[in-house]
């Protein structure tokens, strides 16, 4: 197991690595050639222009102002300078709420760390429990004397740990409640102050039943004119536009090549650009590049127009789902929050996500398929979690060399070199675990897409939930179980089964050393590596050197990325779990967690301001998940402490811990009932009706139908289209007295019903 020297070596490696990353970033960011990599958000907002096109040859690529190198650390205060309301306007509420997770960690753990180091550390260190176990084949190091393992069985000092558990619980619940309340208020204010957006008036309707007499479009029109006659406005059918998407992508590529050849010709008017028609443009007949790509683009444009017309006029491409818009937010809220028919599996309604958040590929999935898909994903996830225990066991074998040496003495000469041993135990386990987890988020995101979620935000929240469960089962519990097995392997082999729980109770607190190494690799060096953006930097310069032909290519060469809720939030929750579990067991871990939260807050605030470009805005809808996982970590810490004290024969203090999980669960239910509705439902009176009234006063002649007409059309339908002329408002606000329908009578008569007509207007 890792000793103090091993932890010191690991800390030195990670501190040097993090400092090198931060120093490299501070220098790279001020170079004009890297401007698009480190400030892409300002380019997207149109507030920054490329410096490569201006200035002398040297100043295009290298910053020649030596005074800027003196101020190279100014990015830290600049990242903290922007006030929160301005940050909401600049980056959105999702980004601000995400940053508040790091602040939540600082608010919870800083006071806990202060109390733990003034009370828990002296109580643990001044005992001799581990010294008395030297004869029992239990492996430990001096750093483990700071943990609960150093207290002998039945000691009255366990009352201090009991009091600490109560203090941690009450303080954490207090901070969680206050933060939940503040963020719920921020969300409601954001929605109240938000400008008019299509998703405020629109509901997604799924699982529309088939009808032998009417098409999907006619059925939707008929259903909502009948059931919501005073509020229904219009609808947007959902098409399977796979072929259209492929055509649009191909035309975009060909248009880019055409622009490149035109620019090439403009630089040298005497020569027309020539291309070869053979394999990869390396052989074959020669042709005029401009004429060739012009004809290709024109042909693809005709194909796209024909495909759009086919999708609009045909019915086979329409899927049983639609975006239904209403004349008011109140009408949309009523529809989204009520059951439409007796059959709860038909005409399913929910608030539509904003247009850029919609994941169109999953809208066509039938309701029955969703159940089957989720069952398949559940089984696949179980086996993925189960088989991942193998690399976890391998990582733990690296972290417990002493235990392996005792069980397998022939390996001792290979790993006894002092520096090598410190690196293996203090640094290698953390980096190995980080590597094994590298591709997991992509796998979990593909699982979420297969499950059928219809918005990017719901996909990320689902993937985050699975990633958190995976981290809890494999990284936390798996590391403890397999690590304890390797660490105390010799002890297990030479003691009776009745003594194994006692050995586990002693060794679990000692696993803090492994998690310390992981926190330093992932939370220190990893966060510093995030701000350096080494991968996007390399990709940008490779594209800029070999693939960029036009200014549009240069704009697309850098992906600004997003906050990555599906990967970042579960990682943060692992630190909450480790901090709450080990606060009363082995407080030595807390300073490492505090460094992570502090560094990550500064780094990600800088990234949110200058780099990340969110793909959607959910107004902090993910916060209930954050709250629930912190509460889960708190309950796990209480149960684990209860189990540890029971193995230490603290019979008088242990029963008093039984009340803590009950109080915590009751607290969670209170917060769920009090604050979660703000993240799930839309208040009809205070929010919907007030905003509708203000709209009618401020813009009495608003043409809402024109505003919503193509808001939820498939993105490829909106490419290269001219806006249609606006219609009069009066036509939108006066529904017909009779609802047109093509449904035939069911009473054995060939005549249509009296309200039927040949075509719905």
UniProtKB/Swiss-Prot annotation:
The chain crosses the membrane at residues 7-27, 101-121, 156-176, 375-395, 419-439, 467-487, 512-532, 583-603, 630-650, 653-673. The keyword tRNA processing does not apply. GO terms for molecular function: calcium-activated cation channel activity. One of its GO terms (cellular component) is membrane. InterPro entries: Csc1-like, CSC1/OSCA1-like_7TM, CSC1/OSCA1-like_cyt, Csc1/OSCA1-like_N. It comes from the Eukaryota. Keywords: Calcium, Ion channel, Ion transport, Membrane, Transmembrane, Transmembrane helix, Transport. Its main location: membrane. It is a multi-pass membrane protein. The keyword Transmembrane helix applies. Residues 718-731 have a biased composition (Basic and acidic residues). Pfam families: PHM7_cyt (PF14703), RSN1_7TM (PF02714), RSN1_TM (PF13967). Residues 718-761 are annotated as: Disordered. It is found in: Membrane. Acts as an osmosensitive calcium-permeable cation channel. Belongs to the CSC1 (TC 1.A.17) family. This is Hyperosmolality-gated Ca2+ permeable channel 1.6. The lineage of its organism: Eukaryota, Viridiplantae, Streptophyta, Embryophyta, Tracheophyta. The gene is OSCA1.6.
